[in-house]
Amino acid sequence: MRNFILSTDWWTDCDDAVALRMLAAAVKRGEINLLGVVVNAYLPETIPCILAFMDDCGLAGTPLAIDRDATDFKGKPKYQYPIAEMVGDKYASVPVEEPVPMMRRLITEADGPVEIIEIGFPQCLAALVEIGRASCRERV
């Protein structure tokens, strides 16, 4: 079975939500393993929003990492604010990891090669490759 990590900006458009929903459907059908999700853009509302969406997709418990140093472009995201407000503190105690250590751990623990789907900003993927070129060549 193919192993995936999704890296997404989870921002103002819908490509991220569609990609996550499609991956969740493939997981439910037993076609793939979604090892984790990385968010490479940051708003404080991102965490409860994406966790609620993942929960709704049947992906509760899937590891999540957020690049908290990523740029907050402000703006007016269509769904982050309303979803975060709707769920309140429901996800406040869910652990959120740092991107590169999580990706390295997931790649090391995987039972085969790992494919990374990159949507948005590539700084987390670039940092992973910079730190572990040899392991990336072998496993990603």
Language model segments and positions:
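N-terminal acidic, glycine/proline-rich low-complexity segments
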Residues: 1-139
